[in-house]
């Protein structure tokens, strides 16, 4: 501590190990203060504090702040990563984003910022249909969206999204050369849809490279957030992103690690991310434990949603006139879970709850 006293109060005389200072840190008067040798004897010529023989005695007479201020020693830095709960004031919550499904929004209270939602369900069970609508409803709410689709080409993705955005009124039936009845977006409506989506929906073009790694997806999302102001992200799906894993065990561990990185990205930027994951073989995604791979995938999620579209051979199809179900199997914020019947419209490729009104997106206002 000798050098700190000298630095703080100004050395006037040094005789061997004895220092005579201009200012006494005990009384702060312009008096002589002497530190004698290395034995720890503190002496002041005039103040009433008396002699202090060790640092413990000095600490007992001065507050921690006074001690560090007097010695010109910086106070210890507070440990990072620890929050005093009583004093913590959380930032005001930004607006939550609706999913567009009334029963689902009531259960989840919409989707909150910084939350990772995992969507699961069987192949051809409606997951991509569902996430496409989530993206459009986010755009309707004013968000810019970035989408990674590992299974749909850019052309097919665009066709799918345009159909969902159009709605039944602006879809016209066409007959293919093979006699199949299909549906196409009205050409005039398509112009308005393009204008509405311009600078608001971005797709990671998977035709640009043959193999897309998990790191590539995070990197592109970072760029989309920085350059295009995207705050809503969709990964469809987890299985299509390449990992460097050699075996099954390493593969599932890599998937869990990637999910953790997606969660970290979501938290850091305070955005919303939707991650599509397949269920375990033989399961339908109606339990959060059904997600294929490491258990951490569902553990990292804020919400887990199962999407199920009935096929003609589904035994549950015989019990209801619904076309499928949406099941909330995990709801970290509110704890409420539930299952809701849904309808599916083939022409528009839209899902809807039984009580939901038909959504008209804002491009129609410009019609």
Predicted feature residues:
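Flexible beta-alpha connector loops of hexameric P-loop NTPases
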Residues: 208-211, 243-256, 285-289
């Amino acid at each position: 501590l000798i050098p700190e006293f000298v630095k703080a109060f100004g050395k006037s005389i040094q005789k061997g190990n004895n220092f005579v200072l201009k200012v006494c840190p005990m009384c702060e008067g312009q008096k002589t203060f002497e530190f004698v040798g290395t034995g720890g004897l503190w002496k002041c010529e005039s103040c009433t504090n008396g002699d202090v023989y060790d640092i413990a005695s000095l600490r007992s007479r001065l507050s921690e702040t006074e001690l560090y201020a007097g010695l010109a020693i910086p106070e210890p830095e507070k440990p990072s990563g620890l929050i005093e709960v009583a004093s913590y004031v959380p930032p005001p919550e930004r607006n939550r984003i609706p999913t567009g499904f009334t029963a689902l929004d009531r259960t989840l209270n919409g989707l909150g910022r910084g939350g990772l939602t995992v969507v699961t369900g069987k192949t051809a069970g409606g997951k991509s249909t569902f996430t496409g609508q989530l993206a459009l409803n986010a755009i309707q709410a004013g968000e810019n969206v970035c989408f990674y689709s590992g299974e749909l080409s850019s052309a097919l993705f665009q066709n799918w999204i345009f159909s969902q955005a159009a709605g039944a009124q602006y879809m016209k039936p066409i007959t293919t050369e093979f006699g199949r009845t299909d549906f196409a977006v009205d050409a005039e409506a398509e112009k308005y849809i393009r204008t509405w989506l311009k600078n608001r929906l971005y797709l990671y073009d998977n035709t640009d490279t043959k193999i897309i790694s998990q790191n590539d997806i995070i990197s592109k999302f970072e760029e989309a957030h920085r350059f295009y102001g995207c705050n809503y992200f969709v990964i469809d799906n987890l299985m299509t992103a390449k990992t460097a894993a050699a075996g099954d065990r390493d593969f599932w561990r890599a998937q869990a690690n990637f999910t953790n990185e997606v969660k970290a990205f979501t938290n850091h930027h305070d955005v919303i991310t939707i991650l599509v994951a397949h269920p375990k073989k033989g399961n339908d995604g109606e339990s959060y434990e059904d997600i294929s791979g490491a258990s951490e995938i569902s553990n990292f999620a804020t919400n887990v949603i199962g999407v199920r579209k009935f096929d003609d051979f589904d035994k549950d199809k015989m019990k209801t006139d619904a076309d499928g179900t949406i099941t909330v199997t995990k709801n970290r914020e509110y704890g409420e879970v539930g299952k809701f019947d849904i309808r599916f419209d083939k022409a528009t490729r839209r899902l809807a709850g039984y009580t939901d009104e038909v959504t008209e997106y804002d491009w129609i206002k410009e019609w």
